[in-house]
């Protein structure tokens, strides 16, 4: 469910009213939410927010890049998003000579707007509930493998059918609520996106890691881009002949401000939620996954930070990588503190005890409710050691040591079939790679993995110990 689904959260922010903290699927606004929204002060109809027959707010709220939310704010494709969302593209366009990260950038004309290769903006053209198509022929007794086989076949078949009916679009069928509901998204993807303006990092990332994930924020966290299209206003690869996208709908920004009690809502692309975790999963998060992530990323970030401070070139090369790593490093720190402070695990245990009491009183053993929680607990506890080692392999090696990345990016078949594309991709990767920095990181990761993992990868015993007498630095 990662960041690809248009949902809406609405809240009345009056001090005398309680916020309705929900995530609501747009196709169900008319049926489920709009009456309550209007009672709280919303002046829009459900069709003003989501419609497949006319332009609506869904046409102004877009997926920016890998999954951020952006909003179209002019009839000529001007787009606002967060600074941290545009950060990767801003970094990619920066150099020591043109240091947009440090100094910011503002195009004084459309001719000065800078193309951002690889950046995409996706417009959701329709959302439909396809649960019956995906789950209709899945037996209620299906095991996990059978369930995955049947649903995968159904998704492939439905995707192909919808793709044929929507030429020029991208179709994605995604599960919600752990596979209990499925939605199909028809998406139009624009690939000519240009940087219009960004504040310097001193504003866009003001407060750095200290300010991140905190409230209230003090950061000027914004950047400005523009979507370009072909002469027919459809998606087109970059060309000087392209023109600004003519928006079907754009957000009109009021300069009148707001007052207490005004209706407010958020529309966009949130990530997946963890609020349905059991107490056993929360315990694993507190004692395994979060501490591992905080420690391993903290060790790597210290090395990156030192090298970035010593060289403008390295600072630019690693700015986006550092920001990506530190984002969920800080998130893990805050999440653990919040769970402990708010007693989340204890509240979950109370809910589970109430559920267990209800199940034992009101259901039969063969219905599966009575032993549901014990089975979940057994599975989570059985995976604890495996997850610990898996996370070290992922965080300390696959994420941290960059020289391993090309092996994941390419294989012989790709390079033979698409040699020019492979060369371009490799050149782009090397542009932001500094071998001395990566070597320092690799040395540290090899050491901490040996210190913390009880079951090490075989190369430790077969190569590091035999050929280098256990010296990970020499290896």
Predicted regions and their residues:
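Terminal presequence/propeptide segments associated with secretion/organelle targeting
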Residues: 2, 8, 15-475
